[in-house]
Structure formats: structure tokens, C-alpha cells
């Protein structure tokens, strides 16, 4: 087995574990805040999403892309920022990681199998959200997340240089090193987005988080609205950053 193959396997496995850790954290927060009837349930979940996202990115970015979100990975593939085969491998690993997170949560839950899955499965708001509300909410939330992920990590700005290493644009300045701040920025984005879908979709903006409890419960209500909104929003957010909002360098 070649060194490159081993690195690919490690990276793919790392993406699965990253998805597992993130998924287990979010599902646990959803379950715990629901069962204890916390008045600050959404705050608990939002903080968990944000802080766990920061920790997972910092912990796994040396061995994998640390997307733990198929919408980000697919957008990276479609904008040619990630190889097709490797990207598909990451997406499969992400889904497996989230499914394993659900499986790990079940023996930890004090309530039954079905009740646990009903709690952690994304559902429209009780205020009367329909499929159209869900679709547009997930579309915009995922587009924002993917744009931030692209701007800070997937496709950050790199000024053009000549053969001597000098900037082509004489007005160019040394770019900001985002390697340290990118996980913080993405994690904070995950956190505030978790509060924005309360009136409609609940705010999932991650096909992996959405699909795992849906598969385990075999309950597919509103699934297409979540999935379509997340993947389409992710693609639009990534494409916008690559083609329109990537800083011009002359």
C-alpha cells in the first residue's frame, strides 16, 4: 500500500470520525434540552453547534478537510476545489459518521428508540412551517455557511505573484493568515445560524445531520425540502464566493 493511499484512507476515516463527534454532540444537546424541558433549549443547542464545530475543525484539520457537512464537500467538488473521487469518499464517510452518532446516542438515551429519533430528527416549526418555508430557510442558511467556509478555508484569497515572488498588483498587501481564525469564524457561523431557522425549519443546514435520524426512523416527511435546500444553497454559496466574491487581483 502506497503512502498516498494510506494518507487518503486516514483522511477519509478522519472525516468520518469528525462527523461522528460533531453529530453526537449536536444530537445529545437536542435530546438533553428536550427531555429536561430547558427554557433555553435553543441557546444550548446553538452553543453546542458552535463550540463543537470549532473544536472538531481544530482537532481534525491536520488529517482531513474537516467539513463534516456534505453540502460543503459537494460545493467544493462542483467548483473544482476538491477532486471528485476523494470528495465522494468524504461525503460517504460523513454520512456514515452521522449514522454512527445516532447509533451511539440511542443506548445513552433514557427514553425509547422512537422517541429519541423523533426528538433529534429535523422537523418544521410548530408555528406552521411548510415545505416551502423549510426549503428557503435551509437554502439561505446553508448558502451562508458554505460561503463563509469557502472564504476562510476552502478557497481563501491568495494574491498573484510573479516569478520572483513579488505581488503582481502593486497595491497588494500581505494577505491575512486565516489558518488560525478560520475554525473560529466557521464555528461562530454555525452557532448563529442555529438560531435563524427557529420559525420555520429549525435550522439544520447539514444534509448529514438531517439524513441520519431520517434513515434510522424511516420517517421521510419534509425530507426533500431539507435536502434540496441544503445542497442547492451550498452550491450557490460556494459558487458565489468563487466567481463573484473572490477578491480581484490584477
From Swiss-Prot:
Gene Ontology cellular-component terms listed: plasma membrane
Keyword Disulfide bond: no
InterPro entries noted in UniProt: Aquaporin-like, Aquaporin_transptr, MIP, MIP_CS
Intracellular or extracellular location(s): Cell membrane
General function of this protein: Water channel required to facilitate the transport of water across membranes. Involved in osmotolerance.
Domain commentary: Aquaporins contain two tandem repeats each containing three membrane-spanning domains and a pore-forming loop with the signature motif Asn-Pro-Ala (NPA). In microsporidia, the second signature motif differs slightly and is Asn-Pro-Gly (NPG).
Recorded family membership: Belongs to the MIP/aquaporin (TC 1.A.8) family.
Name of the protein: Aquaporin
The species this protein was found in: Encephalitozoon cuniculi (strain GB-M1)
Primary gene name: AQP
Amino acid at each position: 500500500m502506497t503512502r498516498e493511499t494510506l494518507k487518503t484512507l486516514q483522511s477519509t476515516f478522519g472525516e468520518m470520525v469528525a462527523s461522528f463527534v460533531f453529530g453526537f454532540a449536536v444530537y445529545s444537546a437536542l435530546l438533553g434540552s428536550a427531555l429536561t424541558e430547558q427554557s433555553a433549549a435553543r441557546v444550548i443547542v446553538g452553543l453546542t453547534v458552535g463550540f463543537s464545530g470549532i473544536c472538531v475543525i481544530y482537532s481534525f484539520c491536520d488529517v482531513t478537510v474537516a467539513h463534516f457537512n456534505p453540502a460543503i464537500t459537494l460545493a467544493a467538488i462542483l467548483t473544482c476545489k476538491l477532486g471528485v473521487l476523494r470528495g465522494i469518499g468524504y461525503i460517504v464517510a460523513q454520512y456514515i459518521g452521522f449514522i454512527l452518532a445516532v447509533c451511539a446516542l440511542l443506548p445513552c438515551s433514557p427514553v425509547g428508540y422512537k422517541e429519541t429519533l423523533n426528538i433529534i430528527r429535523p422537523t418544521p416549526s410548530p408555528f406552521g412551517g411548510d415545505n416551502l418555508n423549510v426549503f428557503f430557510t435551509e437554502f439561505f442558511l446553508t448558502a451562508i455557511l458554505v460561503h463563509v467556509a469557502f472564504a476562510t478555508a476552502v478557497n481563501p484569497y491568495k494574491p498573484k505573484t510573479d516569478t520572483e515572488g513579488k505581488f503582481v498588483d502593486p497595491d497588494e498587501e500581505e494577505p491575512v493568515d486565516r489558518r488560525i481564525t478560520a475554525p473560529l469564524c466557521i464555528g461562530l457561523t454555525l452557532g448563529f445560524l442555529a438560531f435563524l431557522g427557529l420559525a420555520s425549519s429549525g435550522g439544520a443546514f447539514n444534509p448529514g445531520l438531517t439524513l441520519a435520524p431520517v434513515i434510522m426512523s424511516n420517517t421521510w416527511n419534509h425530507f426533500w425540502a431539507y435536502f434540496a435546500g441544503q445542497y442547492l444553497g451550498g452550491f450557490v454559496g460556494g459558487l458565489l464566493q468563487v466567481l463573484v466574491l473572490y477578491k480581484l487581483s490584477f
